[in-house]
């Protein structure tokens, strides 16, 4: 149930697809997430596909968590 008395606040979301086989043309899960985010009137200006390497995943998430313009990080794949 949505509480209508609370004003809407747009959040900025980063989507990270973790895959060794996908690119921006073939990443269906990333595309779905971005579409759903925008349909709910939130922002997704940060989208990246990274390799399925644990060190790279940790590094990327740490970097994005330090970005003051990103409120939420969503990962898919892996």
Residue ranges and their predicted role:
Residues 1-78:
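Non-catalytic beta/alpha edge segments that cap or flank active sites
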């Amino acid at each position: 149930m949505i509480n209508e008395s609370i004003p809407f606040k747009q959040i900025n979301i980063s989507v990270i697809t973790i895959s060794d086989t996908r690119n921006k043309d073939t990443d269906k899960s990333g595309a779905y997430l971005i579409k759903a985010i925008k349909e709910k009137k939130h922002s997704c200006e940060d989208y990246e596909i990274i390799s399925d390497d644990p060190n790279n995943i940790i590094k990327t998430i740490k970097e994005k968590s330090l970005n003051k313009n990103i409120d939420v990080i969503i990962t898919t794949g892996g």
